[in-house]
Amino acid sequence: MSCPYAGNGNDHDDSAVPLTTEVGKIYGEYLMLDKLLDAQCMLSEEDKRPVHDEHLFIITHQAYELWFKQIIFEFDSIRDMLDAEVIDETKTLEIVKRLNRVVLILKLLVDQVPILETMTPLDFMDFRKYLAPASGFQSLQFRLIENKLGVLTEQRVRYNQKYSDVFSDEEARNSIRNSEKDPSLLELVQRWLERTPGLEESGFNFWAKFQESVDRFLEAQVQSAMMEPVEKAKNYRLMDIEKRREVYRSIFDPAVHDALVRRGDRRFSHRALQGAIMITFYRDEPRFSQPHQLLTLLMDIDSLITKWRYNHVIMVQRMIGSQQLGTGGSSGYQYLRSTLSDRYKVFLDLFNLSTFLIPREAIPPLDETIRRKLVHKSV
């Protein structure tokens, strides 16, 4: 197959030398364009009342589903690479590359929403009656993306029925069940973080050193507050320091952390959270450079999915208002708005790491043993 965009602009070039004598597929055959470009069936046209914007609606959603397929393809490969006891530098680099690809795809999907918004509410109303009972709620691939990423069933907002019950065919339900049982990206990243070098109590023991640094940092703040000449200002500062102390206690006390996990306010295990904090502090060390990029990209993915949900919510409100039911029977706008909460944010703990930062000068210094260990780039 030759690419029509790679030549010099001429349709025919008698001097061209074929790279192979084998007969290959031409462009349209390779991409199966006959099937792809014949998959836009306008129901308004079948009803002899063609609505121009229905074609845009179909094309846009088909494009979403194609990109969803690519995201799933990337997630599955990343999960395979993470599902190992040791991940060397080449694999980490490949994981970062593929996560970045997902980020760029999601940016593209966010930017597709304004194209749909070129359609007015009245234009949409002209063909909306043909859509029922179809609904974006029935996008199997988007549900698989959520599950493979790590959205927990118990965290989902439930409307009318369980999310998997909207799929009538058994194959789709099996796909949902398998995606719920298979290790998610969240689970695999958690296992990986738990193995962060430097957490070992018999080694560098970062967590104990971090606690000592926090205690010294807070004590220095208390001493500074006690020198405040205005009593009201002094009491305010002391109260603020005590609140910060309670925040730190939520990560230093395993029982408090586990209670927050059970409540749904945290996602990572206590050990994994320690690993994430350590990588954040020492991200300039060679061994932690790529892991830090990986964690940043996971937050980017969460952020972009949230942006996509938000853009979708605003578009739905523009098209059908906030009171109507969706075409699939869900509460439309109200349901979509409820998915914008932190309960759908998979890597919530990474966003909240900044809560536990301390000044750079207070970060525990690395000893020579761990510094040498962090020069070798495999995690």
From Swiss-Prot:
Residue positions binding heme: 312
SUPFAM superfamilies in the cross-refs: Indolic compounds 2,3-dioxygenase-like
This enzyme's EC code(s): 1.13.11.11
Enzymatic reactions: L-tryptophan + O2 = N-formyl-L-kynurenine
Pathway: Amino-acid degradation; L-tryptophan degradation via kynurenine pathway; L-kynurenine from L-tryptophan: step 1/2; Pigment biosynthesis; ommochrome biosynthesis
The keyword Zinc belongs to this UniProt entry's keyword annotation: no
Cofactor binding summary note: Binds 1 heme group per subunit.
Range of residues in the leader sequence: none
Binding-site list for substrate: 57-61, 128, 327
Pfam families reported in the protein's UniProt record: Trp_dioxygenase
Keywords from the UniProt entry: Dioxygenase, Heme, Iron, Metal-binding, Oxidoreductase, Tryptophan catabolism
GO biological process assignments: L-tryptophan catabolic process to acetyl-CoA; L-tryptophan catabolic process to kynurenine; ommochrome biosynthetic process; protein homotetramerization
Similarity-based family: Belongs to the tryptophan 2,3-dioxygenase family.
Subunit structure: Homotetramer. Dimer of dimers.
Record's function text: Heme-dependent dioxygenase that catalyzes the oxidative cleavage of the L-tryptophan (L-Trp) pyrrole ring and converts L-tryptophan to N-formyl-L-kynurenine. Catalyzes the oxidative cleavage of the indole moiety.
HAMAP family attached to this UniProt entry: T23O
Name by which UniProt lists this protein: Tryptophan 2,3-dioxygenase
Gene name in the database record: v
